[in-house]
Swiss-Prot record:
It comes from Candida glabrata (strain ATCC 2001 / BCRC 20586 / JCM 3761 / NBRC 0622 / NRRL Y-65 / CBS 138). The gene is FMP52. It is found in: Mitochondrion outer membrane. The keyword Transcription regulation does not apply. It comes from the Eukaryota. SUPFAM superfamilies: NAD(P)-binding Rossmann-fold domains. This is Protein FMP52, mitochondrial.
């Protein structure tokens, strides 16, 4: 496969940061773009597009023919100011940018979702995640990869803190890569989500298929992809 161009959304968050770092570090990509509300000081070798007005992001997508879109674009209910506003970012903005990317010739999309995502869930968050997955799949990208991490571990630059989150992370760290990790649904590091997302995208892009493909990657497979990548590096 010749060297490609990729776009990363949500790089100010934990998973997005590591998707961007993994894409930049990969020899598969000649150029990597990020679109965000603020600049990203932790990575230099990418084309940063910064605009606080996310409603203009679709028009800011690269005009060149990019084949890969990685998105972990998301917020919290508290940060957004309510669930309806969270939905506008997590669902509506993701869908708008995915549609625009496909119109620009993008073939492979990697979406960071969540374990338990289900459009029929009684929990608003998991129902929203399930609706995002369904609507992204309906766009019929050549390859759709949906990452469903469980407990997310790692340092967050967005200060997504609080007693509940801190406690969950502490418990997740206790089970991380232990014999009992399945009890917590296989906790993963944000870095591992980034590595797995890029590796899964490259694997799918190598497949010569005529019909659109959809691949779900849960936490246990995320760990397997990371181990295989490190063993072969």
């Amino acid at each position: 496969m010749s060297k490609q161009t990729a776009v990363v959304l949500g790089a100010t968050g934990l998973c997005g940061e590591h998707l961007l770092k993994s894409a930049v570090a990969s020899q598969a990509f000649e150029k990597v773009y990020s679109i965000s509300r603020r600049s990203l000081p932790y990575v230099a070798d990418c084309e940063q597009i910064v605009d606080k007005d996310s409603s203009s992001w679709a028009s800011l997508l690269p005009k060149e023919n990019f084949k890969f879109l990685f998105t972990s674009l998301a917020t919290t209910r508290a940060a957004a100011g309510g669930f309806d506003k969270q939905y506008q970012i997590d669902h509506d903005l993701n869908l708008e940018l995915a549609k625009a990317s496909k119109a620009n010739g993008c073939e492979t999309i990697v979406l960071v979702s969540s374990t338990g995502a289900n459009k029929n869930s009684w929990m608003p968050y998991l129902r929203m995640k399930g609706e995002i997955e369904e609507d992204i799949i309906a766009l019929n990208f050549k390859h759709t990869i949906i990452l469903r991490p469980s407990a997310l571990l790692g340092d967050r630059r967005d200060h997504h803190k609080g007693f509940g989150n801190d406690l969950f992370v502490k418990i997740g760290n206790c089970f991380y890569r232990s014999r009992l990790q399945s009890i917590m649904g296989y906790p993963v590091q944000g870095e591992e989500v980034g590595i797995a997302g890029v590796q899964a995208a490259l694997q799918e892009a190598e497949k010569n298929t005529e019909s659109p493909t959809v691949r779900y990657v849960g936490s246990s497979e995320i760990l397997e992809l990371v181990d295989n990548f490190k063993n072969n590096s």
